[in-house]
Amino acid sequence: MTDTVQTLIPTLDVSERVARPKVEAGVKLRGAEKVARIPVKIIPTVDLPKKPDWIRVRIPVSPEVDRIKQLLRKHKLHSVCEEASCPNLGECFSGGTATFMIMGDICTRRCPFCDVGHGRPKPLDVNEPKSLAIAIADLRLKYVVITSVDRDDLRDGGAQHFADCIREIRLLSPGVQLETLVPDYRGRMDVALEITAAEPPDVFNHNLETVPRLYKAARPGSDYQWSLTLLQRFKQMVPHVPTKSGLMLGLGETDEEVIEVMQRMREHDIDMLTLGQYLQPSRNHLPVQRFVHPDTFAWFAEEGYKMGFKNVASGPLVRSSYHADEQAKIAKAML
């Protein structure tokens, strides 16, 4: 089912390279500045490819969208919906839900598929767990996804801050279901998992993002096997909590590679899967190599269920937290 795809990403000519900026604490680098020092350089896309009809989304403008944005500003919170330019922002915000991003909006990684800014983060806001809990109570949410930037500057990678947020939220909203979408805790897996197991979420999510062949280009600083091991070890420590992971398609992978990664996920006890289309945030990000047809996404879902995934969300506009409440309900019923 796979066409031949271009997988090599050319290196910028020395004369064309962006000058490497000095990164100061609290300064957010995006676009060309962000990816200036990654191993595989990005040539800015001159003409962005036209999106097929099945990718078109409604412009996220509505009173409910504005209300939630105002509430986030009031409590000095960040939503990954905005920071990562999610195509489902309008639908999710209009439905009165949001995925909250904790530990600031500056990431210590430089992944060139991602629209979140890079830099040296400021110290953690010790009031954030309480502010997040108050915002969730104000919104009267029943299902909440909490994610974060990577914080390689922290000894535990931010695991304790996740746990503090979970504790505060459950104090103010005892009935809420919580899903965490965590970083890879590079070099800190043991301590991070000990903390997480002591205050576990209702769903534990960590995205592999792409196939291992593309990690150097798409996830510099991350390791494919490390991420698989993180998910499996959590499952071994807290077996009653569903584990979840996801991939973006369109970065240059083949269908066969996607199937192989899905099989590896099942070998590492991952219960839930999300597959969605990669959309290039700007001309300075990794280019889209292909737009995967909805029929192919449907085929991946069929194959996933055959492998034993409890739930598979697979479609062009699917993102990790898209309809996460429905995904979790189905997966938990099957555990």
Swiss-Prot record:
It is found in: Cytoplasm. Gene3D superfamilies: Aldolase class I (3.20.20.70). One of its GO terms (molecular function) is metal ion binding. Binds 2 [4Fe-4S] clusters per subunit. One cluster is coordinated with 3 cysteines and an exchangeable S-adenosyl-L-methionine. Belongs to the radical SAM superfamily. Lipoyl synthase family. [4Fe-4S] cluster 2 binds at residues 107, 111, 114. It catalyses: [[Fe-S] cluster scaffold protein carrying a second [4Fe-4S](2+) cluster] + N(6)-octanoyl-L-lysyl-[protein] + 2 oxidized [2Fe-2S]-[ferredoxin] + 2 S-adenosyl-L-methionine + 4 H(+) = [[Fe-S] cluster scaffold protein] + N(6)-[(R)-dihydrolipoyl]-L-lysyl-[protein] + 4 Fe(3+) + 2 hydrogen sulfide + 2 5'-deoxyadenosine + 2 L-methionine + 2 reduced [2Fe-2S]-[ferredoxin]. This is Lipoyl synthase. It comes from Pseudomonas savastanoi pv. phaseolicola (strain 1448A / Race 6). It holds the Pfam family Radical_SAM. [4Fe-4S] cluster 1 binds at residues 81, 86, 92, 321. The gene is lipA. HAMAP family: Lipoyl_synth. Pathway: Protein modification; protein lipoylation via endogenous pathway; protein N(6)-(lipoyl)lysine from octanoyl-[acyl-carrier-protein]: step 2/2. One of its GO terms (cellular component) is cytoplasm. PROSITE patterns: RADICAL_SAM (PS51918). Keywords: 4Fe-4S, Cytoplasm, Iron, Iron-sulfur, Metal-binding, S-adenosyl-L-methionine, Transferase. Signal peptide: none annotated. It is an enzyme of class 2 (transferase). Transmembrane segments: none annotated.
